[in-house]
Amino acid sequence: MVSIRLPDGSVRQYEHPVTVAEVAASIGPGLAKAALGGKLDGELVDTSTVIDRDASLAIVTDKDADGLDIIRHSTAHLLAYAVKELYPDAQVTIGPVIDNGFYYDFSYNRPFTPEDLEKIEKRMQELAKKDEPVTRRVVSRDEAAGYFRSIGEKYKAEIIESIPQSDEIKLYSHGGFTDLCRGPHVPSTGKLKVFKLMKVAGAYWRGDSKNEQLQRIYGTAWTKKEDQDQYLHMLEEAEKRDHRKLGKQLDLFHMQEESPGMVFWHPKGWALWQQVEQYMRRRVNEAGYLEIKTPMIMDRSLWEASGHWQNYRENMFTTESEKRDYAIKPMNCPGHVQVFKHGLRSYRDLPLRYAEFGSCHRNEASGALHGLMRVRGFVQDDAHIFCTEDQFISESIAFNTLAMSVYKDFGFDHIDIKLSLRPDQRAGTDETWDRAEQGLRDALTACGLTWEELPGEGAFYGPKIEYHIKDALGRSWQCGTLQLDMVLPERLGAEYVAEDNSRRRPVMLHRAIVGSMERFLGILIEHHAGAMPVWLAPYQAIVLNIAESQAEYAQSLAQSLQKQGVRVAADLRNEKISYKIREHTLEKVPYLLVVGDKERDAQTVAVRARGGVDLGVMPVEAFVERLQEDLRSFK
C-alpha cells in the first residue's frame, strides 16, 4: 500500500506503486491532461516517475512557476532537436533555463543568421505539433559517454566524463533526439505551444575564453500567448528606455574603447549625478553619518590582512612602486576600519557612522561590461557603522527607515527585501549567528517590512539584508545592502574600550542604499525613460526666444531664474521656434519657456510642460512658484 498526501491535506492510497501521471488521473481527467510534472517530497520530478513509498505530492501544471520552468527547459531541448534536424553537423552542448526563457549553445562551422532562426523556430513548431512523447532512461556514465561519442557529440561526452563514475545519468528522448539532462521534462512535445527565438550571441565552451567559441541561441517560452506578447512588449519598451541609447540622445555620457568600463560624463549627465550625490549627502548627514575620504591606492599588506589579496586579487587592479605592491581599492571597508582605529575609541563614541562616496575599481571581464550597469570604475554611497552588540538592532532599524525613504523619493515604490542566512562554511558560533539573524529580523519587523529568507546565502562573515527595487517595467534590481560583519574588525584589529575598561571588537555594519552610483543612474534613466523628475533634471527649464528681438529678454530671464536656484539655460539660436521646441522636447526638459514680443513687453512667459502640455502665459513669479511647488511635493 502506497499513501500519497496531497497539498490540501487529503491522503490517497494505492494498492501498488503508481506514477505521478496516474495519481493525477485518479484525481480527475482535467488534472491528468494539465499535469507537467510533480513535486515529490519537495523534489521536482517527471510525470512518469514511479512512487513506491509513502510520500507527499503536488501535481505541477502550467499555473505553477515550476511548470513554466519545465516548459522552458523542454523548449530548450526542442530547439536542439530542431537544430540537429536542420544542421546535422552542428554539435550540441548545454541548454539551461534562464530568467524569462532559455538558451542553448551550439558548435557550428558558420554563424547562425536571422534567417536561420526563422527556419529553426518554424521547425520547432512542426516538431511540437507532432506531440511526441518525452521518455527518460537512466544509464551508467560509461554507457552515456559511449553513446554520445558514437554519434559524434564530443561536447556532451566531455560533460558526462567529468561526472563521477558512480553517478546515474539521465537521458531524455523525443522523436529522433536524445539529450543528457537532470530533468524533469514535459510528458510530450505537444505541451510546448508558445515560444519564440530571440537572438544569437557568442559564448565560450565552459565559460572559459581559452576554449572554443560557441553560438548561443536565446529563446523565450510561456504558457499563454498573452503572457509572451506582454513580455515582448516589455522588451520593446526596455529597448526604448535603454540607458545607453538615452545617454547618447540626451547627451549625458559616453564610453569608449580606450577606457573600457569607465564613464565619460558630459555636463548634463554630471549635473544629474550631482543632484543624486548631493541628495544622498544631505540624507546621510541628517541621519548622523560623518563623511570621510580614504585613499584609492593602498599597500598590499593591508589587503592581505583584510583577506582581499588572497580571495579577491583577480578582481583587483594592482601596481608597483619602489618595490612595494599596491592595489587600487575594489571596496572601501578596510579604509574605514583604519579611520576607526586611528585613536582610542570608547563605548561612549559608539555608534560611529562613517560615510564615503568612495571611488572603487574592479577588474571585470570585458565581456561582462554593460553601459553604466556593469563598469570597472564606480562610486559607491558606502558607509560603515561601528557599534556595540546592544546597538546593532536600533542601527539596522534606522537604516531600513532611511533606505525606504530614499527609494520612495527616487520614484521606487515596490521594494523586495531578502535576508541571506548562515552558510555551511562560516565564522563565529551558532549562538552568534542566532543573535545576528534574529536581530536583523527584529529590525525588519520593527519597520513593518516583509522579507524572503534565503538559507545558506549569507557571507561566511555574517548575515545580510538585500533591497531589490522594481522599476517601471517590473524588472528587479538589487541596490541596497545591510551586511553584518563578524570578521573584518578582528582581522584588522578594530577595538573599543567598553564600560568595564575591557577591549572589545565593535559590530561592523556595511551598508549602501543606491550601491554603485553609475549603476543606479542607469536604473534611474531607464525607470523614468530619461524624463527625470523636476528635482533631478539636469535642466529644469529652457528659455526660447522666437526672434532676435527677444534675445536680450530671454537671456536676462534665464539669468534671473538661475539666481533663484533654477537649473536653466537660454536657447538664443537663430532657428525656427518649432525646431527649438521639438529639439528640447526630445531632450525631455520639464519646462520650455517661450518668449515673443508680447511676453517681453508684459514681462511674462508662455509655459509648456513636458509632454506638450500648454500651461499658457503667466508672470515669471507664477512660473517660479509652480516650479517650487513641484520641488515641495518631492520634499
From Swiss-Prot:
Region forming the signal peptide: none
Name listed for the protein in its UniProt record: Threonine--tRNA ligase
Gene coding for it: thrS
Lineage of producing organism: Bacteria, Pseudomonadati, Pseudomonadota, Betaproteobacteria, Burkholderiales
Cofactor(s), names only, from the UniProt record: Zn(2+)
Annotated HAMAP family: Thr_tRNA_synth
Co-factor remark: Binds 1 zinc ion per subunit.
Subcellular location: Cytoplasm
Species per Swiss-Prot/TrEMBL record: Burkholderia cenocepacia (strain ATCC BAA-245 / DSM 16553 / LMG 16656 / NCTC 13227 / J2315 / CF5610)
Positions of the TGS domain: 1-61
SUPFAM superfamilies xrefs: Class II aaRS ABD-related, Class II aaRS and biotin synthetases, TGS-like, ThrRS/AlaRS common domain
